[in-house]
């Protein structure tokens, strides 16, 4: 007579074998379509309307950087830098910080300018 098989042990082995092979093939990840940016068609030179807008609106901005001006007026960054230098030289905007890579301006208020003059006069 053949030896008895342990049915309890076989059932555990069978469960382990089923669990290991039960996953099947994993689904292949689909490549997502990359985000497409719209091409910026910014002005290289000022036209009359944009130049007027520069002198009217930009001095009233609280934070003035070449990137902000470029984005709002739809002009190139190099043109925005040159325009901000011009506005600063005319005293329409005030320099906050100057760095080789980033220049930050703010609106020139008459109150802050007079306070600076008074403080310098006091010292």
Swiss-Prot record:
Primary gene name: RPS25
Out of the domains of life, which is the source?
Answer: Eukaryota
**Basic residues composition bias: residue spans:** 25-34
Name it. Small ribosomal subunit protein eS25
Listed under GO cellular component are:
ribonucleoprotein complex; ribosome
Key word Secreted present in the record? no
Organism, per UniProt? Branchiostoma belcheri (Amphioxus)
Q: Which UniProt keywords apply?
A: Ribonucleoprotein, Ribosomal protein
Q: Where is this region: Disordered?
A: 1-34
Biased composition regions of type Basic and acidic residues, renumbered to the chain = 1-13
Gene3D superfamilies listed in its UniProt record: 3.30.63.20
- Keyword Secreted in the entry? The reply is no
Q: Lineage from the top down?
A: Eukaryota, Metazoa, Chordata, Cephalochordata, Leptocardii
Which residues are listed as membrane-spanning?
A: none
Q: Which family does it belong to?
A: Belongs to the eukaryotic ribosomal protein eS25 family.
Pfam families for the chain: Ribosomal_S25
Q: InterPro entries attached here?
A: Ribosomal_eS25
């Amino acid at each position: 007579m053949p030896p008895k098989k342990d049915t309890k042990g076989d059932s555990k082995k069978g469960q382990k074998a089923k669990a290991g092979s039960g996953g099947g093939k994993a689904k292949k990840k689909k490549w997502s379509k990359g985000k497409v940016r719209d091409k910026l068609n910014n002005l290289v030179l000022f036209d009359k309307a944009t130049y007027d807008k520069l002198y009217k609106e930009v001095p009233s901005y609280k934070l003035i950087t070449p990137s902000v001006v470029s984005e709002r007026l739809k002009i190139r960054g190099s043109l925005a830098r040159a325009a901000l230098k011009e506005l600063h030289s005319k005293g329409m905007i005030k320099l906050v910080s100057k760095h080789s890579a980033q220049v930050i301006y703010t609106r020139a208020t008459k109150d802050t300018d007079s306070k600076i003059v008074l403080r310098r006069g006091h010292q």
